From Swiss-Prot:
Cytoplasmic-side positions: 62-66
Membrane topology, record value: Single-pass type I membrane protein
Compartment annotation: Host membrane
Protein name: Transmembrane protein B66L
Major localization class: host cell
Organism: African swine fever virus (strain Badajoz 1971 Vero-adapted) (Ba71V)
Family: Belongs to the asfivirus B66L family.
Keyword Membrane applies: yes
Superkingdom of source: Viruses
Keyword line: Host membrane, Membrane, Signal, Transmembrane, Transmembrane helix
Extracellular topological segments: 21-40
GO cellular component terms given for this protein: host cell membrane; membrane
Amino acid sequence: MDIKRALILFLLFLVVLSNAFVDYIISNFNHAVTCRKPTYFGIVLQGIFLVILFSIVDYLINENIL
């Protein structure tokens, strides 16, 4: 993994674990957030979002779009 992918993965990790992401995205799913904290289901959703976003970014890097 080159430095570009590693940096983007770290930034995506910060975004997915941010309070804004939890409040606006994860909280839309039933039983994913309790008292503004992700439940186990919410943590799984964060992982799924991270994998999907990284896959998209990786594709864009491989196609020389990013």
